[in-house]
Amino acid sequence: MKAIIGHGTWYDKVAVEIIERERRLGRSLDLLRVESGVAASGIPHIGSLGEVARNYAVALALREQGYNSEFIVFSDNKDGLRSVPKGLPKSLEKYIGYPVMEVPDPFKCHSSFGEHMISLLLEALDECGIEYRFISAVEAYKSGLLNEEIRTILENAEKVSRIVKDETGQEKYEEALPYFPVCSSCGRIYTTKAYKFLPEEGKVLYVCEGMEIKGRWLEGCGYEGEADYTKGEGKLSWKAGEFAARWRALKIRFEAYGKDIADSVRVNDRISREILNYEPPLHAQYEMFLDKSGRKISKSVGNVFTPQVWFRYGSPQSLLLLMLKRFVGTRNVSVTDIPQYMNELDELEDIYFGKKHIADEKERAKLTGLYKYVWLMKPPAKPSPHIPYNLLTYLAKVAPKGSETDFIVEKLRRYGYSNLTLTEELKRRIGYALNWVRDFAEIKETSVELSRNEEKAIRDIIEALKTEVKAEKIQNLIFEAARRNGVQPKRLFRTLYRILLGMPHGPRMGPYIVAMGRENVIHSLERALKEGGGSPSST
């Protein structure tokens, strides 16, 4: 068997690949920088956080290999507003083409639209515990961080144009420099066309002639002027050099990117190599999060699922689990997935603390490693009480108003959680369940595939529950139904837990069924028979 690398995860393998690559390139290993570029032009969704979380996990993996790493969050707040995201005021339409930091905040709580949007993402990163060095594009251009790279790119504008055409077929930079000045007359950025570089003066000449944005023509004001790139009076085109400029100026060694910008990354890789003489960072491509209808979750189409929504019903670690458990492939995701990830996090914790045995050493290492990354290498010292999300939401639904927490804790102790204490973690979990019940009627039940023998046993249980009311007798009749139908009792209990709680374990079944209400349990079991029955006999 091959040796396990680091903590056995994909992130550890990438970290080793980065280190070996940097050695081959002969570059310093004193500080290895990882970057995420983040937009400020729309409401940040869970995909925005996903990109940052995955890049940060690589930065952590480099540290776990014994190297200093720094994680940079680069805010694209010099970009212009290309469209008004759905749900925001139509009055913002008049600001299309303006830099997002010059667009007023429609919520009137920040200095600008861009400031508001980036604050939402940074708030989510802080909630997750992600540590980062924040760099604002506005400040980077103004401070001269990218001056050398801008100059080299503008001096080689014809070569940049050929690279863009080779890689994408676009010819727009045959007539324009890959630089957008901010028009000093109307204030827009995308309507300007830079047509001449004055290297001695550090300036470009431009005309504000207009530009097609999102399928419609945005008319320029006609002004002709000059912009000083050394003073941050414009920005590079991100498709034709800005990524490359950042990589070289900041000595970035790794950056993952979304499938939707693959062409731009390919162009920037070549610009970095062929024009800036800097071997670009190692990359990994990830795919998009989709909503349940299969559409890409997007700032502009109105199906935004934000980290803040997730944090109302689930922990930051459960969201990081969604982000980090798999890197490739698109995933359909919605708020209804939160209970599943909360329960899955508990299962990972059982593996990490040795309460659940995984025989395969590599699989065990990968899962315990994933748990560490979900906790950003600061896992808890001891396991927390694992109470199924469905159980908490049921108790939250029937709890008397004003004393919900006391009621839930008392009931849990009666269900067999005898040593339960009201820790901060338990308070948070109860809070998630209470929020769920306030906002949603119930958790969508999951389908469970049943063998024919399990199906027969469940039919027996349904019949018995129509007359039996005592918890202890209900507990015993489940054992009897299992034996009578040739099903291992442990397997039948696991199946019942999956049907009723969405996970393979839970509180003592007899008292739980009484508390849930026999009619409710019968309904759930009948639904399971309808949806999951008919597979071959198995014990």
Predicted features and spans:
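Basic, alpha-helical terminal appendages of large translation-related enzymes
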Residues: M1-L29, P44, E70-F71, S161, ...
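Charged, often glycine-rich, active-site loop that binds/positions anionic groups
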Residues: D79-Y95, E149-I150, K296
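Catalytic adenosine-cofactor/nucleotide-binding cores of aminoacyl-tRNA synthetases and other
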Residues: D260-V265, S272-I275, L282, Y286-N435, ...
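N-terminal catalytic cores of NTP/NDP-binding nucleotidyl/phosphoryl-transfer enzymes
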Residues: M1-G87, E242-A262
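The substrate-binding groove and active-site-proximal loops of carbohydrate-active enzymes
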Residues: A40-G47, V100-S112, V138, K142, ...
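Active-site cores that bind ATP or allylic diphosphates and position pyrophosphate for catalysis
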Residues: I130-V301, P307
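Residue-level signal for inorganic ion chemistry
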Residues: H45, I153, N268, S315, ...
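A glycine-rich helix N-cap at a beta->alpha junction
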Residues: L92-E115, L120-A124, C128
